[in-house]
Amino acid sequence: MNFVDVEPTLENYWRAIILFGRNTASYKFALAKSLIDVSLDSKSDLITLDDLALPYAMHLCEHLKHSPKQSTSNNSKFIQACIDFNQGAITETQLIDTTTKEGFKYVLDAFHVVNTKAVQERFYDVIDEEFFIDERKFNKGIRLTDNLFKLFYVFDHSAENLNQETESRWNLVEKAWELNLNKNLVAVEFDQHTKQLFSHDSRHRRVGITSSRGALNG
């Protein structure tokens, strides 16, 4: 079954963003996980960039510890700030300041953009509202919509399941970058003895990708 034939539910709309959005950097994944965090914890639908900055940056900081390549660009002030924070070179306050200034420049505009036109039309014809509204110009933040709260606060287990799927997709993109492969060309194999998923790098060496299992299901 083609993905566009799947029922256009909020869960599948989220999956479309995670699966088919652009992956020139991992900011989309960090933002997605941050949105899950704030939708569960916030008492207001208005989230300032200052409040969103720390959970957003910390997700990226955590991934940088095991996957240094988080962007196809080599000159990101935001990523450098996360690296500096991990190394103890800057404070949490400095990390938040840099994240607020540099970390949201493109990701908020790009988050809901799905590159596959058929998927985009399939969901936008049925789901009449995105997961957040950009209010940086007037309120220095974003406003969470009912769709986000329905998805992660009302529906049972959605936060847990989609959080893991987002994490797994992030791991898979990292692995593709590590192998210097297009993320759609990662050949997945299964070792019957160890019960682990693996692929091969450009030198035909085995590389484990079991951490990406959630993104490969289905």
Sequence positions of predicted segments:
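Mixed-charge, low-complexity interaction segments
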Residues: 1-217
